[in-house]
């Protein structure tokens, strides 16, 4: 088994010529390699809808973890329920932070997402994912190379130094148009915020709509240097 500790540049070959640009092949390899020791960390963005549909074909009882920061859009929570109905066999876990919002306010002051967004992300996303990955050998992410400069070198199989794990990224070669084409073709549910200018959807407090021609992640932490929550730093 390929693990963080036994990592070497792997020579596993995945064909990119099929409809899924290698995604199904990558997922089939991952679930064969890691069996029950792999989890998909899903934010329920539009890429997530594609991956959930593909994962359901490969492993209908797969583990899916949603990092519930308690400050997501209501539309996101409603979408999760729709996904549960569409894919009832998937094991969707809504992972909570250890601190409630009130406890966080008492320890760090009100509106931590404004005063110290990095700490807020650490408490409400990074630490919960660390806990979720503690007993796993690998995790799946919906990163695409097209999304941003920080993601353009992502590979199918990555050694993840941040979480000392293997990170599997099946959608690296997909374009934004291809993601949506797949969603429409298979009549997949998606967050209606995508229809009103939100290409990337995170917490309600830190996500704004993006103007025409803007980068897909321009609405995340708008006005701040921050562009990532920290889950995908190496």
Swiss-Prot record:
Residues of the active site: 229
Known role: Catalyzes the formation of sulfite from adenosine 5'-phosphosulfate (APS) using thioredoxin as an electron donor.
Record-level GO BP terms: cysteine biosynthetic process; hydrogen sulfide biosynthetic process; sulfate assimilation, phosphoadenylyl sulfate reduction by phosphoadenylyl-sulfate reductase (thioredoxin)
Record-linked NCBIfam families: APS_reductase, cysH, PRK02090.1
Entry binding sites for [4Fe-4S] cluster: 120-121, 203, 206
Subcellular localization(s) per the UniProt record: Cytoplasm
Gene name of this polypeptide: cysH
Entry protein name: Adenosine 5'-phosphosulfate reductase
Key word GTP-binding present: no
Metabolic or biological pathway: Sulfur metabolism; hydrogen sulfide biosynthesis; sulfite from sulfate
Source lineage: Bacteria, Bacillati, Bacillota, Bacilli, Bacillales
Family: Belongs to the PAPS reductase family. CysH subfamily.
Entry's EC annotation: 1.8.4.10
Catalytic reaction list: [thioredoxin]-disulfide + sulfite + AMP + 2 H(+) = adenosine 5'-phosphosulfate + [thioredoxin]-dithiol
Gene Ontology annotations for the cellular component aspect, listed alphabetically: cytoplasm
Molecular function terms, GO-annotated: 4 iron, 4 sulfur cluster binding; adenylyl-sulfate reductase (thioredoxin) activity; metal ion binding; phosphoadenylyl-sulfate reductase (thioredoxin) activity
Cofactor(s) needed: [4Fe-4S] cluster
Keywords in alphabetical order: Cytoplasm, Iron, Iron-sulfur, Metal-binding, Oxidoreductase
Gene3D superfamilies linked: HUPs (3.40.50.620)
Cofactor note: Binds 1 [4Fe-4S] cluster per subunit.
């Amino acid at each position: 088994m390929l693990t963080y500790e036994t990592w070497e540049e792997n020579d596993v070959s995945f064909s990119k010529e099929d409809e899924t640009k290698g995604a199904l092949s990558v997922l089939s390899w991952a679930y064969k390699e890691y069996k029950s020791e792999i989890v998909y960390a899903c934010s329920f963005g539009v890429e997530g809808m594609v991956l959930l549909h593909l994962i359901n074909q490969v492993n209908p009882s797969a583990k899916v973890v949603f990092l519930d920061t308690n400050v997501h859009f209501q539309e996101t929570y409603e979408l999760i329920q729709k996904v549960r109905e569409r894919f009832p066999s998937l094991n969707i876990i809504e992972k909570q932070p250890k601190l409630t919002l009130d406890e966080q306010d008492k320890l760090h002051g009100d509106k931590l997402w404004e005063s110290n967004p990095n700490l807020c992300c650490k408490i409400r996303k990074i630490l919960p994912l660390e806990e979720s990955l503690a007993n796993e050998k690998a995790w799946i992410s919906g990163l695409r190379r097209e999304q941003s400069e920080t993601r353009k070198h992502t590979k199918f199989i990555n050694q993840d130094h941040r979480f000392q794990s293997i990170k599997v990224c099946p959608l690296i070669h997909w374009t934004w148009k291809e993601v949506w084409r797949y969603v429409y073709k298979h009549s997949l549910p998606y967050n209606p915020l995508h229809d009103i200018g939100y290409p990337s959807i995170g917490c309600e407090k830190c996500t704004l709509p993006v103007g025409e021609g803007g980068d897909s992640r321009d609405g995340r932490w708008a006005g701040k240097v921050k562009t990532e929550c920290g889950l995908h730093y190496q």
